[in-house]
């Protein structure tokens, strides 16, 4: 009997709180029907305004190498752009080495990313690996020296660190499209990308401590941010591999799709991004990275703010006054609260 009274009392208190929170004018019948909007209902309203995301097959056009010396084509990568769409795709093309990178690979990747950045028709970039067995297996250990990785007749270097920074600073989203192994330095490459879409055969993990290597930069800090410090320690200290499903659960990737749907789904994400404001996306990427990138991150965010300011009448007044050798008149611009 006492339990029944306590339950009734609790129900009455809950009813009082509920009635207090419901706005005036709501009838009890309407209040009972209030619930969170479902994803499907929100999607329906969105689609009425914007329409469905196109699902037609993308047409890729190969982009020729425009670089140094006698080399007229890329050797270690394939660089393509979608016909009449703002999507670029950069593919590491060393499947015989599980798409491991060497210094030449990194140089070509950086040239392609630079071109995609400078091309105003490109809004999103896909990074992937040739074939279905590996996205990237990291640095090619056969070319590793005491000075880093060295191509024949070249000095050793760790130029992949420059590539990591380039991807982070690039003012357009980069999506890692992962099939097969993303391990070692390849695992770090997908982490520095903005989004990761994985096939159901994808495998993730770090190998460094097994082969006498490590990444104490982005490979540690970004991983800790993505999966938490404890899980990051597990991944580095134990050098275990994780399935795509496990990676999704720990927040390491965004989604998992069947292997046969990988490119289709990735292109769909690209098309959704391309619907949105490129300036908003640019500044958001800089802001999201700034917290982890210290002064360099703040510099990137500040640079974006400067570019936006250059497009205002206030900035134009300052430049025009200087060019005309007169004092600027900033009094006509509001000092917003």
From Swiss-Prot:
One of its GO terms (molecular function) is 1,4-dihydroxy-2-naphthoyl-CoA synthase activity. It is found in: Peroxisome. InterPro entries: ClpP/crotonase-like_dom_sf, DHNA-CoA_synthase_MenB, Enoyl-CoA_hyd/isom_CS, Enoyl-CoA_hydra/iso, Enoyl-CoA_hydra_C. Its cofactor is hydrogencarbonate. It catalyses: 2-succinylbenzoyl-CoA + H(+) = 1,4-dihydroxy-2-naphthoyl-CoA + H2O. The keyword Aminoacyl-tRNA synthetase does not apply. Pfam families: ECH_1. Its EC number is 4.1.3.36. It comes from the Eukaryota. Homohexamer. This is 1,4-dihydroxy-2-naphthoyl-CoA synthase, peroxisomal. It comes from Arabidopsis thaliana.
